[in-house]
UniProtKB/Swiss-Prot annotation:
PANTHER family: UPF0212 PROTEIN MJ0068, UPF0212 PROTEIN TK1194. It comes from the Archaea. Belongs to the UPF0212 family. It comes from Thermococcus onnurineus (strain NA1). The lineage of its organism: Archaea, Methanobacteriati, Methanobacteriota, Thermococci, Thermococcales. This is UPF0212 protein TON_0350. Pfam families: DUF555. NCBIfam families: PRK03922.1. InterPro entries: UPF0212 (IPR007564).
Length: 126
């Protein structure tokens, strides 16, 4: 049994926004509200970053077209007592997916939990 940090990518669509800052604020609020409703306040929510194909600079993954925004977000959760990395991935997707219905979740990163990172998370019990 292992302990893992799982980072998932999630595209969040928001409506009635004018700027990318508005889109980010609404998306963070929308995700936080959904997670808190399921008592998942220990999930860390961060804005995703994209890389410019020309210059290589990083920028926030928030795009607005016609008052509709698309915001890329990273959701980080700690999973305890998972049998394998794949098991940790399934647990993370199930837990976060329950709160964010109809939002596709893709694994961005999975790594073993270090002693400094231990804290609140999801524990799997057989």
């Amino acid at each position: 049994m292992g302990d893992y940090v799982v980072v998932l990518e999630a595209p969040i669509i928001v409506r009635d926004v004018e700027t990318s800052e508005d889109a980010i604020n609404v998306a963070v609020s929308k995700v936080a509200k959904a997670l808190n409703k399921e008592k998942l306040d220990f999930v860390r929510v961060e804005i995703g970053y994209s890389q410019c194909p020309v210059c290589g600079a990083h920028f926030e993954s928030a795009f607005v077209i016609g008052s509709v925004g698309l915001v890329g977000m990273y959701l980080t959760i700690k999973v305890y007592n998972a049998q394998t990395i794949e098991h940790a991935e399934r647990i993370a997707k199930a837990v976060i997916g329950k709160a964010l219905k109809k939002v596709p979740l893709k694994v961005y990163e999975i790594r073993e939990l270090t002693e400094e990172e231990e804290g609140e998370g999801v524990e799997f019990e057989e």
